[in-house]
Structure formats: C-alpha cells, structure tokens
Amino acid sequence: MGAIKVSAFVKAVPSAARGLLSDELRHFKVAAMPWLSQSYYDDKSIHYELVKLPSRYGENAWEMGLHFESKTAERNSALLRYFDRHLFEVRDALGDDWVAEIWDRGWTKVYVTFVYPVLTEELVAPTAERLAHAIRTLEPLRRLAG
C-alpha cells in the first residue's frame, strides 16, 4: 500500500471518476485546493465536492457530496427541497448514509461522510467509483431541478 498525500488524492479521484462516466457526464471542470476538489458543470457554485474534513469531525474523516453554494440562500434551499423530495431514490441508489441538509452561509448539500484510517493510492479507484456513482445518480436530478 502506497501512502498518498491528501492534495494528490483529491486531484486523482475526479480524474479517475471522469473515465467511469458516460460521454454526457464526463465533461466537468475541477477546482482543487490542498484539502478538497470541486467537480462542476455549468456553475461552479453547484459542485460535487470531495473534502478531507477538519479533525473536529473525527480523525481521517471525509465528505463527498453535491453542494449548493450559490450566492442566494433561496436557490440553495429550493435545490435542497427538490433533492429532499427525491431522497428515498438517492438513498436507494447510493446508500442509507446519504443525507440532505442545510449547512453554512445559506448553503445546502446532499452528502455522505466516511473514514479512511490510512490514505493510500489504492483508495483512489474505489473513491472514484463512488464519486462517479454519485454523479450518475445526482446529476440527472440536478439538471431536472434547474
């Protein structure tokens, strides 16, 4: 098992996920910081985020999800309400641990948290598959929501 830095991991996962998606879904852009990556289509404020959470959330905790971070809390709330109405479908596809909730600054999100006790290169592929599966499930709903 080869250790990997968080900054390399958050860049590698979206790149690997892209290859697992249909042509229609693989053309996203990526913005990265040392602790997170944001994969998005037409609006950067609506993105799929993979983030290493601060230690106050637990050691080696991660989050993956669809974040609604537009400048208007009303838009973010409307998107959250739409996804909340489809949460049974989302959980059926992605797992019961996915939640939809209000977050910070008027932002909202549909997400899951998980722990990787040790971050290794071998975790890139399964995490990319998890991200690709989330995009395949959530992006059609996001596009319908507007």
Regions found by a protein language model. Name each.
Residues G2-R18, R85-L94, V115-G146:
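Ampiphathic alpha-helical segments that act as solvent-exposed interaction surfaces
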Residues A8, Y41-I46, E59-E63, R81, ...:
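Short, well-structured alpha-helical interface segments that form or flank functional binding sites
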Residues M1-E59, A93-E101:
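Charge-rich, low-complexity N-terminal segments
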Residues S22, R26, R75-R81, D96, ...:
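Generic detector of ordered, mature protein regions
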Residues L53, E69-A73, V115-P117:
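Generic structural motif
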Residues G65-Y111:
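Short, internal acidic amphipathic alpha-helical interface segments
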Residues S39-D43, K109-V115:
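Short, solvent-exposed polar/charged micro-motifs at secondary-structure junctions
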